[in-house]
Amino acid sequence: MSPKGRRHEIVRLELGYRFTRQASRDVFVAPEPQFNLGPDTFLVPDVLLHPRAIATPDVRGSDALLVVEVAETSLAYDLKTKAMLYAAHGVPEYWVINASTLMTTMHTPPSGNAYASAPEIAPDKLLVPTMVPGLAISLDSLGLQ
């Protein structure tokens, strides 16, 4: 895996900060957790949102409310390989944010080893997680353009 660049870290940290400030008490925002998808499969997403009632190490794919990957050098891998893994394990919503352009690919809902929909959303548009509609963010608001 490639080392994370400066821009990647800024986007990841700002996103985590904004989500944490907006999240209700029943939603936990986990930065870079070990996410156990199955007995032999785990990934470390940049941000994982899940019900606070479930401890982060116990969260499985279908428990997740939102998984976010910020991609700088790993964009193709995050859009293909990780999307297949997350879909196959029932993650209901998966975002890939291009750290350079702030374009976001919103994958929903899982269907087998893929997602039924994966539109690309511009940074000036409001991103609203389907499982956590109280959280909304426009990546333009991060002030990184």
Q: How should these model regions be labeled?
A:
Residues 1-145:
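Gly/Pro/Ser/Thr-rich low-complexity, intrinsically disordered segments predominantly at protein N-termini
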